[in-house]
Design a protein with these regions (language model features):
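Dinucleotide-binding Rossmann-like beta1-alpha1 core, especially the glycine-rich loop
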Residues: 79-159, 282-287, 293, 321, ...
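Beta1/beta-strand and adjacent pyrophosphate-binding region of the FAD-binding site
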Residues: 33-46, 63
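Flavin (FAD/FMN) cofactor-binding and adjacent substrate-gating region
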Residues: 101-104, 125-196, 201-202, 207-215, ...
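Flavin-dependent oxidoreductases
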Residues: 49, 112, 208-321, 329-340, ...
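C-terminal catalytic lobe of FAD-dependent flavoproteins
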Residues: 282, 318-438, 443-447
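Central beta-strand plus flanking loop segment that forms part of the substrate or channel wall
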Residues: 79-84, 120-123, 248-273, 329, ...
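Glycine/proline-enriched, intrinsically flexible loops and inter-domain linkers
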Residues: 404-405, 410-838
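Glycine-rich FAD pyrophosphate-binding loop
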Residues: 55-75
């Protein structure tokens, strides 16, 4: 297959760098301020969007500094696709905001910009599993007011007449897919921000950052210093140059990315309409119309990182050398799908850096370990998402939270393991799978293992299959044989019966599991309980040797965090929460410490690992390996003891996430294996077997136990989440006034438990819940309950649809299935198993 090349690679006007934009050309910028509320560093889409949205949230005294011209980094050479498609509702919502914002900019009579916002786009599929995934994502988008359509191969060809239907089942249609002029977009945002009071300083390089005792900042630049309250890193591929000035490393890596623009194509000139965009996970490319030709971009397997060893300080408005030999395989797939490409001449080749994070999702929010510092970085699809990311970040900065739960974007979701080598491996993997979405329970192999315990190889030898939780390898289930492989799908798969057998073992005898990475913070000092009372919305258990569960709210009265509080000694508490919450919770606690230094915090997350012993024989097994009184009278529910498990020192808590009698055994990592061996040997006579996180997930759904950032979201308050019993309005706590106001206005949604009338697949987080064809809610988590024999889901629904017995429809594989609201916690709802005294 041969492609004709045009002579020369001059840039088309649409692809030119901004040298400078209309807003800067011929104008003298104002003298630089010495003080301001916020300084945004970086003049690409991330910085311009953040600046504009800060003014929209009421902060007019803000500035942006850019080392060169606006859009001179990645933004200027972006292919600039704008789509509604996202992997969760937060991403769909922010992209929908981008589209609405860009449309308003394009319609501004004073400064219109080029935005093709209704060409439509198709994500192709050649397997039924991909089509089922698209149906799920279409269901999820409906809950955000976004309408996708799943279409067959013939309809794909009707809407895009240049494609072949060979090896094609269908695709996902986004009617609002399109593309935008990146330079014009950023200039329009900067223009609106200036009109609202913001200032932009070009050719102003940041040389250092200094944070003061009052937590304010000084931004040192080549044109002078600026004192400010807040600093925002929006530096694109130079993110870690500015990060280093704060003493932090951001897990962001740049990848070389190539596309070319063809000469005019006769079939396009004759079509009479613009061609839709194509995104192809089959052959790893995208293609859209550019003037009267096509723009074809590649995500080749033979890809390259960029800038790992430093970036030329003069690299601006620049590109990397083109290397089309790397993309030969991708080109062959594109030619087969669009034969017209084989006769097209290349007009322009573009190869420039784009940024990726460890999980492919941008880092938007607080900089870990720093106060009054934020970032908006790692935007691999910056033009399409940038409007929404800047919108959410501005809300976080001004109000403390955004209108959506933004944990999927939070920079604190990576807790110390995001080094440069891991980031490079994951960036390569994500680049190679750009259009291949993750299936449920799919954990890709690059950069694994990065966080392990001494038991990881032991459990692997026992047949464990591992999930990844905050970088930690965590046992998901035990494989029946070494060559067992599950088929990743949105349906129930080969693991269904395996997990059921593990649940049965826990229910009828005894099971043992490892919970790696469990977040634990030791709190010591005087007045601990009084301090915690001001943080938790419910009463804090104060008695030594007692364990309690509580919830913290943000200043808006919505759920911030959940934790167990274990009273080890009179002046020593263990705070325990989700593995992913390690940095998040520590920073929240630190931010509210007494100024007198009477209370100290110490992370024990990496020093200990938790074993869970659960089932009716758990107490008997524990009694054989410790001299503690393990009777129900001596060691009842929600108590904590210090002792030994075999020869290993341990902190043992009688708490359960399964609903069965259970003990959390916290062991120092250097003696973890000793404790594990003692339990395995003692358990042999009682039929002990290993069980994993998938069994735990099933059992917690049956018990009505909620997961942080799945069911516990900053969008809802504890009353709406069904946690009213954990709130004590007779005391003061953070968020109380806001909560009182919300309660007086009535619930906006309510969290309910649903029983779904189908057995072939679970629902999944984000799926729509409907009544008479109208979306009235969203699934937060779902799965099969083996002990109750039900297909279960949690969902936030309209308050008048929350009564048990209400009949609804829940989307499963994107299609509505009958469902009914049931009482929460269908397994042992009265906790008789956990409360029994004998």
């Amino acid at each position: 297959m041969k492609i004709k090349r045009a002579i020369g690679l001059e840039l088309m006007p649409r692809l030119r760098p901004n040298l400078p934009g209309e807003e800067g050309r011929g104008k003298r910028e104002a003298q630089m301020k010495s003080t301001t509320r916020a300084v945004v560093i970086g003049g690409g889409i991330a910085g311009c969007s953040t600046l504009y949205h800060l003014t929209q949230e009421g902060w007019a005294d803000v500035v942006l500094v850019e080392r060169d011209e606006l859009t001179s980094g990645t933004t200027w050479h972006s292919a600039a696709q704008v789509t509604n498609f996202g992997m969760n509702q937060t991403m769909v919502g922010l992209k929908s905001h981008s589209i609405a914002l860009y449309k308003s900019l394009a319609e501004d009579p004073d400064y219109p910009i080029n935005y093709h916002h209704a060409d439509g786009g198709i994500r192709l599929a050649n397997t039924e599993a991909q089509m089922e995934g698209y149906r799920h994502f279409a269901s999820m988008a409906r809950g955000m007011g976004v309408n996708f359509e799943v279409i067959d191969a013939a309809e794909c060809a009707r809407r895009h007449p240049l494609i072949s239907t060979d090896n094609l089942l269908g695709g996902l249609w986004d009617p609002l897919d399109g593309d935008i002029d990146p330079a014009q977009l950023c200039q329009a945002l900067a223009r609106r921000a200036r009109k609202a009071g913001a200032e932009v300083y070009r050719h102003t390089q940041v040389t250092a950052l200094t944070q003061h005792k009052d937590l304010s900042w000084t931004v040192h630049t080549t044109k002078g210093d600026i004192d400010c309250e807040v600093v925002i890193n929006a530096c694109g591929y130079r993110v870690n140059e500015v990060g280093a000035m704060m003493g932090v490393h951001h897990p962001v890596m740049s990848m070389e990315h190539q596309y070319f623009v063809t000469e005019p194509i006769r079939q396009i000139m004759d079509a009479g309409h613009r061609m839709p965009l194509l995104r192809c996970p089959i052959s790893d490319y995208y293609c859209r119309q550019e003037k009267q030709g096509l723009l074809l971009g590649f995500y080749e397997q033979d890809c390259k990182t960029w800038g790992m060893d430093g970036i030329d300080p003069d690299f601006a408005n620049a590109l990397c050398p083109d290397d089309l030999d790397r993309v030969t395989d991708v080109l062959e797939g594109a030619f087969a799908r669009m034969p017209v490409l084989m006769e097209a001449g290349i007009h322009t080749v573009v190869n420039g850096p784009i940024t990726y994070t460890i999980d492919g999702t941008p880092l938007v929010g607080p900089v870990p370990g720093k106060r009054n510092a934020f970032c908006i970085i790692g935007l691999r699809a910056g033009l399409g998402e940038g409007g929404g990311h800047g919108w959410l970040l501005a809300q976080m900065i001004v109000h403390g939270e955004a209108c959506y739960d933004t944990w999927c974007l939070d920079p604190r979701r990576f807790t110390g393991h995001g080094n440069v080598e891991l980031t490079a491996l994951k960036a390569i993997e994500d680049y190679q799978n750009e259009f291949r979405f993750h299936f449920p329970h799919e954990y890709r192999p690059a950069g694994r293992p990065i966080k392990t315990t001494p038991l990881t190889p032991v459990l692997a030898s026992e047949g464990a299959e591992f999930a990844v939780v905050n970088g930690w390898e965590r046992m998901a289930y035990i494989k029946p044989s070494a060559d067992f492989r599950e088929t990743h799908s949105f349906r129930f798969n080969e693991t269904f019966d395996l997990v059921g057998d593990e649940v049965k073992a826990v229910t009828t005898s005894v099971g043992l599991s490892e919970i790696s990475g469990f977040n634990r913070i030791e709190i010591t000092g005087t007045g601990i309980h009084d301090w915690l009372e001001g943080l938790f919305c419910g009463r804090v258990r104060r008695q030594t040797s007692k364990v309690g569960l509580g919830y913290m709210l943000n200043h808006l009265g919505c759920v911030k965090a959940d934790a167990t509080i274990a009273n080890i000694d009179d002046n020593r508490i263990w705070y325990g929460s989700a593995a992913a919450a390690e940095y998040h919770d520590m920073e929240w606690l630190k931010a509210h410490l007494p100024e007198d230094g009477s209370i100290t915090l110490r992370s024990l997350t990496n020093a200990f690992t938790t074993l869970v012993l659960a089932g009716p024989m758990a107490r008997a097994v524990l009694g054989e390996v410790t001299r503690l009184d393990c009777s129900k009278e001596g060691f009842g529910w929600l108590q904590v003891r210090q002792g030994f498990v075999g020869i290993a020192p341990a902190v043992i808590m009688s708490v359960s996430f399964s609903g069965e009698e259970a003990f959390e055994i916290h062991l120092p990592n250097n003696q973890l294996y000793a404790g594990y061996l003692a339990l395995r040997r003692a358990g042999e006579a009682h039929g002990l077997r290993l069980f994993g996180s998938m069994a735990i997930e099933s059992m917690r759904l049956e018990k009505g136990y909620l997961h942080w950032k799945a069911d516990l979201l900053t969008e809802f308050n504890p009353e709406e989440t069904g946690l009213g019993r954990f709130v004590d309005m007779t005391k003061d706590f953070i968020g109380k006034l806001a909560l009182e106001k919300m309660i007086s206005g009535g619930p906006r949604k309510k969290l309910v438990t649903l029983e779904i009338d189908c057995t072939h697949a679970p629902s999944h987080g984000g799926a729509s819940v409907s009544r008479d064809g109208n979306v009235i809610g969203t699934v937060t988590s779902a799965g099969w309950g083996y002990r109750v024999g039900k297909n279960l889901a949690y969902a936030f629904v309209e308050p008048d649809m929350a009564e048990p017995g209400t009949r609804l429809e829940v989307d499963v594989l994107g299609l509505p299935e009958k469902a009914v609201v049931i009482a929460p916690g269908p397994y042992d709802p009265d906790n008789r198993i956990l409360r029994q005294k004998t």
